[in-house]
Design a protein with these regions (language model features):
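Conserved C-terminal alpha-helix-loop-beta "cap" of PLP-dependent enzymes
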Residues: 177-300
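Conserved PLP-enzyme active-site core in the AAT-like
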Residues: 1-163, 167, 173-176, 180-184, ...
Length: 302
């Protein structure tokens, strides 16, 4: 393992992949607890780069309830990235002991330039703060780089930004489904985070879509999107992110691992008008290059 990894500290790790068959997933948890003692279960709400629906808070509640029935002292820790403010609850009200996320995603409202948050049981939050600063100091000291006002303003804007992003994700799903591609989630269905997955089945088309979205960006629209390696990933990535905040995924952006079956993951958007413009531009370019036909442009119900 890398320096400072869990393995270096002799902390064992076991992964259970989430699949659409939720019952079999629960069976894997029970089986794992029978074979191993467990201090903490890390639950990833979003789909990441896998082809599955992101977890709902109701599903997270079932997982946490099951884990606590197997071991009441086990900590349920939820990576809540992309999920904040999407549903009418958050995982900490559904049995999670602690959650964490990024401020260049949902809660930052597209204006917070860096940072993250933790929330949940006070003792666990203080433990995280002690790890961030130093033992004995914890949350009583630290630095926010003078971003207090931006963080509060971003939090104030976040519900509206999430609303626009959700409308945009549904429109992306509808457009690509009308073009004949598999999409997840389907348009006009329940969503538990901001991510819209599209299966393009073609590396050249992935590059074309990412480049078109980059060209419609408010920042760096002139840049070429090229595949590149990134630490922590096992394949090259394409990223379209002409965003005001570098790396922001609460702003309209897309990324894709360059591996079969060539899925692209679209998220964010500060207002639906920008997402419409990006989709219109993409469709115009695909028509011009005869990659789609006018017959495939069905009226949208969105």
């Amino acid at each position: 393992g890398g320096k400072g990894s869990l393995k270096n500290f002799e902390i064992e790790y076991k992964q259970i992949n989430i699949c659409e068959n939720f019952d079999s997933f629960e069976e894997k948890i029970v089986h794992s607890f029978k074979e191993n003692s467990c201090k903490l279960v890390f639950i990833q709400k979003s789909c990441g780069y896998s082809w599955r629906k992101s977890l709902t808070n109701h599903q997270i509640e079932k997982i946490c309830s099951l884990i606590h029935s197997l071991d009441p002292n086990c900590i349920c820790f939820v990576d809540n990235c992309y999920g904040e403010l999407v549903e009418d609850s958050e995982p900490i009200s559904k049995g999670a002991n602690i959650i964490a996320g990024s401020l260049i995603k949902n809660l930052g409202g597209t204006i917070v330039p860096t940072g993250g948050y933790v929330a949940g049981d006070a003792e666990l939050v203080e433990m995280a703060c002690s790890r961030l600063t130093s033992p004995g100091i914890g949350s009583s000291a630290g630095i926010n780089f003078g971003l207090g006002r931006l963080i509060l303003q971003g939090l104030f804007l976040a519900p509206q930004i999430v609303h626009e992003s959700l409308k945009g994700a549904d429109m992306v799903a509808a457009v690509f489904k009308n073009l004949g591609f598999k999409v997840l989630p389907e348009p006009a269905t329940y969503r538990s985070d901001l991510i819209q997955s599209v299966r393009l089945n073609n590396p050249d088309l992935v590059q074309k879509v990412c480049q078109s979205f980059q060209n419609s960006s408010p920042v760096d629209s002139f840049l070429n999107v090229v595949p590149s390696s990134m630490d922590g990933y096992d394949s090259k990535l394409l990223m379209a992110g002409g965003t005001f905040i570098e790396g922001s995924t609460s702003e309209f952006s897309a990324d894709a691992p360059l591996r079969d079956p060539y899925n692209i993951f679209v998220q964010g958007g500060s207002h639906i008008a920008h997402i419409k413009i990006a989709l219109i531009r993409l469709l115009s370019e695909l028509l011009e290059e005869k990659l789609i036909s006018k017959d495939s442009l069905l009226p949208l119900s969105t």
